[in-house]
């Protein structure tokens, strides 16, 4: 059950000039469901992406990296993305790579572009051959129904164990020019930073130089999709793609030092964070949405390290599910996070506005009923004060329920 998942009105997902989306039902794994997505990008756009750090990365991730490397070396720009659900094309060896390249070649043939101008993506079951003929057979239909307003359908077409489609959109003004941003994401399990079994596609109509877009993609991922965790597993397929169509009247953003870049970065990060948080709210079996903030560190990295130790802990997550204020589990996670020279005698722990631990020990004024009150909420904030610096970091996570086990035990049935 999704946690306070906002209602998404398809009419509020703004079309992005220069970007069209089409879908098909190709029976990749299950019949009568959208499972192929094609995104077409007009000539002149720039595209960038960041991908999983899992060494067992899926075949389409390898091909995406190859094609983007050619673009950065001066090759023709990306003109299309193709996504299939139901099969990850991971753990499939050389045949999987051949299938990813064959998918690009077939879409390129149908669209009149070069295979190197296509980025492929897959999500679903690992270690099973991609049903390439079914995927290829679905491409003509996906191309035929492309439209600029198909963002909600596109969000549905990339779902796996997601219970709801995930999309976000906004318009901002930069230097007097209107910029439109719309994105979709998918993911509900195998969610951990760097990134997860997560796909995210975010388009906007600003014109951005390739090196600047590359920097923006990494920066935005680090402040959004790399700040979420559901179960601590890092997937083979995770990908986050930025598309800058260049159709807006705003002059090209050619430097990361410009005020226009700062404004765009803020807007893109806001949309990406919304998409990332939707993934956590729809986490497999999730009943609670939890924000973990660690403050007073020597660096943002050590703050994030502690935040993730809390967010990954099965004991912490099951305590949240049970509404059990067994909050010593949080202190234990802080202690094993691996931060050197951590003085636990300086640490304060808050649960929402309730001071649970002060100077490394139980707050004498803390009452368990106060902790119980917070633990029963569907949204909870954990705040840790380290008392050793000015850095901070925030992550978003969820609880761990019986349903998480059931969903993953039944995943292939």
Swiss-Prot record:
GO terms for biological process: L-arginine biosynthetic process; ornithine biosynthetic process. CDD domains: OAT. Keywords: Acyltransferase, Amino-acid biosynthesis, Arginine biosynthesis, Autocatalytic cleavage, Cytoplasm, Multifunctional enzyme, Transferase. The record marks 196-197 as: Cleavage. Its EC number is 2.3.1.35, 2.3.1.1. Gene3D superfamilies: arginine biosynthesis bifunctional protein suprefamily (3.30.2330.10), ArgJ beta chain, C-terminal domain (3.10.20.340), L-amino peptidase D-ALA esterase/amidase (3.60.70.12). It is found in: Cytoplasm. SUPFAM superfamilies: DmpA/ArgJ-like. The record marks 123-124 as: Involved in the stabilization of negative charge on the oxyanion by the formation of the oxyanion hole. Pathway: Amino-acid biosynthesis; L-arginine biosynthesis; L-ornithine and N-acetyl-L-glutamate from L-glutamate and N(2)-acetyl-L-ornithine (cyclic): step 1/1; Amino-acid biosynthesis; L-arginine biosynthesis; N(2)-acetyl-L-ornithine from L-glutamate: step 1/4. The keyword Amino-acid biosynthesis applies. The active site is at 197 (nucleophile). Catalyzes two activities which are involved in the cyclic version of arginine biosynthesis: the synthesis of N-acetylglutamate from glutamate and acetyl-CoA as the acetyl donor, and of ornithine by transacetylation between N(2)-acetylornithine and glutamate. This is Arginine biosynthesis bifunctional protein ArgJ. It comes from Burkholderia pseudomallei (strain K96243). The gene is argJ.
């Amino acid at each position: 059950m999704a946690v306070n998942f906002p209602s998404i009105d398809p009419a509020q997902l703004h079309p992005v000039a220069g970007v069209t989306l089409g879908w098909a039902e190709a029976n990749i794994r299950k019949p009568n469901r959208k499972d192929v997505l094609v995104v077409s990008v007009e000539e002149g756009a720039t595209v960038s992406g960041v991908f999983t750090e899992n060494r067992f990365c899926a075949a389409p991730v390898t091909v995406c990296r190859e094609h983007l490397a050619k673009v950065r070396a001066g090759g023709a720009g990306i003109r299309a993305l193709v996504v299939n659900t139901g099969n990850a094309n991971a753990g499939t060896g050389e045949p999987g790579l051949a299938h990813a390249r064959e998918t690009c070649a077939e879409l390129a043939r149908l669209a009149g572009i070069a295979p190197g101008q296509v980025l492929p993506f897959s999500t679903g079951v690992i270690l099973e051959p991609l049903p390439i003929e079914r995927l290829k057979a679905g491409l003509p239909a996906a191309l035929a129904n492309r439209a600029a307003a198909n963002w909600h359908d596109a969000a549905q077409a990339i779902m796996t164990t997601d219970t709801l489609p995930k999309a976000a959109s906004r318009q901002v003004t930069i230097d007097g020019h209107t910029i439109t941003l719309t994105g979709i994401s998918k993911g509900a399990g195998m969610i951990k930073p760097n990134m997860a079994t997560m796909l995210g596609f975010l388009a906007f109509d600003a014109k951005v130089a390739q090196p600047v877009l590359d920097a923006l993609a990494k920066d935005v991922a680090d402040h959004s999709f790399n700040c979420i965790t559901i179960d601590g597993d890092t997937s083979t397929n995770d990908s986050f793609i930025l598309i800058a169509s260049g159709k807006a009247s705003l002059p090209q953003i050619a430097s990361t030092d410009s005020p226009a870049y700062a404004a765009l970065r803020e807007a893109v990060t806001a949309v990406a964070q919304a998409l990332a948080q939707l993934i956590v709210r729809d986490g497999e079996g999730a009943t609670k949405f939890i924000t973990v903030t660690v403050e007073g560190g020597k660096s943002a990295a050590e703050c994030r390290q502690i935040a993730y130790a809390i967010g990954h802990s099965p004991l912490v997550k099951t305590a949240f599910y049970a509404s059990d204020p067994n909050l010593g589990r949080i202190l234990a996670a802080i202690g094993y996070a691996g931060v050197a020279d951590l003085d636990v005698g300086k640490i304060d722990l808050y649960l929402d506005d309730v001071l649970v631990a002060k100077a490394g020990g139980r707050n004498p004024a803390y009452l368990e009923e106060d902790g119980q009150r917070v633990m029963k909420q569907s949204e909870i904030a954990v705040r840790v004060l380290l008392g050793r610096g000015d850095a901070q970091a925030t992550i978003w996570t969820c609880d761990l329920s019986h349903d998480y086990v059931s969903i993953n035990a039944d995943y292939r049935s």
